[in-house]
């Protein structure tokens, strides 16, 4: 239900038409299917049945996987996105450490520059000021701020880490089917990256 979030406090990382074109295909964008957008933001999501009207719309949505992916990447605090309410999304991320970072890395992969600093990477992948990505970056480089030649190689290493985590996760029972399909489609963009078993 991202159509109502344009211009909100959420930090949408990639606003290109190619990336956001799926929104026009969303079931929630059709007033005949979803006349009242407020159903996607029930006052008490933990109350039994509160999210069922929204989930029924998501169940027939052709882009539910895209919606859920972006909600996980952006860590949407409220609402039903891609068929999952916010408590369900939080639980999903808590069960798989590193999943939010890996999904975000894949989401912004085509924006990662060749020349990159530790701070650039943290800003690009996680958001300015966040320390969540630093352990990943520190695999090869201590935090310094000096520009590193071969940032492309660093990008590939980061992508391999993200792909390994996400591929394993989508093959398990924990990944919602619409998101698994969407992630598999996205992974096809990276055939040159070797994913270890």
Per-range role (PLM):
Residues 98-115:
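Short, amphipathic alpha-helical "recognition" segments used to contact nucleic acids or chromatin
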Residues 144-166, 174-175, 183, 196-197:
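Short Lys/Arg-enriched helix C-cap and helix-to-coil transition segments
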